[in-house]
């Protein structure tokens, strides 16, 4: 794949997450009874960064959970018995019933990953509401899903790929478009 353009560098990612944190606080009246749930892998790290910013602003910690939605994906081919992944589902260190859950992911594309994340959450409990925060929304939805908080809208063609790199995983903070 050939890199076409850098969309967000480290500073732009930091600014986008700070803005999203402020929007979350404003919409959720100080983040009382709110839990962030990051979708594995990069969504978890983004959720942790958002929680840190919210705590800096509000002075109160925010609970962060993890969603591993491998089992729930409808677009993954069946694995052989020897290659079954270890599936955790939702690992949220608090009761989600009657709480506001904010699902955090790096890129919103077709909406299938978010739908799978909501399926995993409903298996754990019944939140009062579910919101969605993404670093990048690239369009091309196949399901009626939209983000409540968006770092950057990046219209792309289906022949392009948006790749998010984060220090915690990739030793670099960067969002770029690649040609397939």
UniProtKB/Swiss-Prot annotation:
A motif (PRPP-binding) lies at residues 101-113. It catalyses: UMP + diphosphate = 5-phospho-alpha-D-ribose 1-diphosphate + uracil. Coiled coil: none annotated. SUPFAM superfamilies: PRTase-like. It is an enzyme of class 2 (transferase). CDD domains: PRTases_typeI (cd06223). Keywords: Glycosyltransferase, RNA-binding, Transcription, Transcription regulation, Transcription termination, Transferase. Its EC number is 2.4.2.9. GO terms for biological process: DNA-templated transcription termination. Pfam families: Pribosyltran. InterPro entries: PRibTrfase_dom, PRTase-like, PyrR, PyrR_bifunctional. One of its GO terms (molecular function) is uracil phosphoribosyltransferase activity. Homodimer and homohexamer; in equilibrium. PANTHER family: BIFUNCTIONAL PROTEIN PYRR. Belongs to the purine/pyrimidine phosphoribosyltransferase family. PyrR subfamily. Regulates transcriptional attenuation of the pyrimidine nucleotide (pyr) operon by binding in a uridine-dependent manner to specific sites on pyr mRNA. This disrupts an antiterminator hairpin in the RNA and favors formation of a downstream transcription terminator, leading to a reduced expression of downstream genes. Also displays a weak uracil phosphoribosyltransferase activity which is not physiologically significant. This is Bifunctional protein PyrR. It comes from Bacillus pumilus (strain SAFR-032). The lineage of its organism: Bacteria, Bacillati, Bacillota, Bacilli, Bacillales.
């Amino acid at each position: 794949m050939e890199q076409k353009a850098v969309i967000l560098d480290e500073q732009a990612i930091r600014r986008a997450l700070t803005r999203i944190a402020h929007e979350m606080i404003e919409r959720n009246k100080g983040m009382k009874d709110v839990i962030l749930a990051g979708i594995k892998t990069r969504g978890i790290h983004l959720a942790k960064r958002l929680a840190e910013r919210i705590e800096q602003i509000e002075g109160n910690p925010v609970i962060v959970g993890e969603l591993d939605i491998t089992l729930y994906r409808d677009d993954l081919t069946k694995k052989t018995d020897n290659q079954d992944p270890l599936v955790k589902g939702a690992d949220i260190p608090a009761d989600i019933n009657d709480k506001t859950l904010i699902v955090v992911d790096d890129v919103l594309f077709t909406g299938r990953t978010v739908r799978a994340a909501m399926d995993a959450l409903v298996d754990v409990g019944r939140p009062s509401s579910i919101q969605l925060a993404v670093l990048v929304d690239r369009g091309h939805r196949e399901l009626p899903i939209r983000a409540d908080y968006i770092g950057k809208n990046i219209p792309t063609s289906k022949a392009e790929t948006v790749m998010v790199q984060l220090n915690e995983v990739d030793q670099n903070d960067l969002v770029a478009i690649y040609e397939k």
